[in-house]
Amino acid sequence: MRLILLGPPGAGKGTQAQRIVEKHGIPQLSTGDMLRAAVAAGTEVGKRAKAVMDAGKLVSDDIVNAIVSERIDQPDCARGFILDGFPRTLVQADATEAMLKAKGLELSAVIEIKVDDAVLADRISGRYTCANCGAGYHDENLRPKVEGVCDRCGSTHFKRRADDNRETVVERLQVYYKETSPLIGYYYAKGKLQSVDGMADIEHVTANIEAILSKL
């Protein structure tokens, strides 16, 4: 089961990815986490990435693609994975397709979580995560079962992203619609796209995604 979740900031991709990980036992592959791990491990591609980052430059698509490729070869990805934050552009999508094909693999599905722009500001400004394990929560829609205690690891320390505020929502949406939303048409043309209504409550969104996954 090899998946990509698409949707604007605040659509609930992180929450749903977390639930897929817990239910199906496949890893969620975050480009940021993979970059840091490759640099820490001192792999060849990690050294290339470190040199670029130390110079204060953005890591190129070819380096990110190489790190994703390296990560997918790890044993815990044998049953599948969820790509988180990659691909973001059509160029990256083409590179991902070519990389998977070279390994004899293909994407199982690309799931688009559709949410109206009008509600995204409320969703984004209310988000926070466990500082220890990264579990996601929301002031209104997804509070811990015990107030102030993480459901997953029991930590009492939480944090909010600096850019999770109303002022940056418009800018982040503009970037999404310019760079990432073209992927919806790209994967639709390949017969991989599945859409779910992200305006529903979290449990209904999860159920709709599971209905899609059950047919893969």
From Swiss-Prot:
It comes from the Bacteria. ATP binds at G10, A11, G12, K13, G14, T15, R127, A200. Its EC number is 2.7.4.3. GO terms for molecular function: adenylate kinase activity; ATP binding; zinc ion binding. Zn(2+) binds at C130, C133, C150, C153. Signal peptide: none annotated. Residues 126-163 are annotated as: LID. Its main location: cytoplasm. It is found in: Cytoplasm. Residues 30-59 are annotated as: NMP. It catalyses: AMP + ATP = 2 ADP. Consists of three domains, a large central CORE domain and two small peripheral domains, NMPbind and LID, which undergo movements during catalysis. The LID domain closes over the site of phosphoryl transfer upon ATP binding. Assembling and dissambling the active center during each catalytic cycle provides an effective means to prevent ATP hydrolysis. Some bacteria have evolved a zinc-coordinating structure that stabilizes the LID domain. HAMAP family: Adenylate_kinase_Adk. Catalyzes the reversible transfer of the terminal phosphate group between ATP and AMP. Plays an important role in cellular energy homeostasis and in adenine nucleotide metabolism. This is Adenylate kinase.
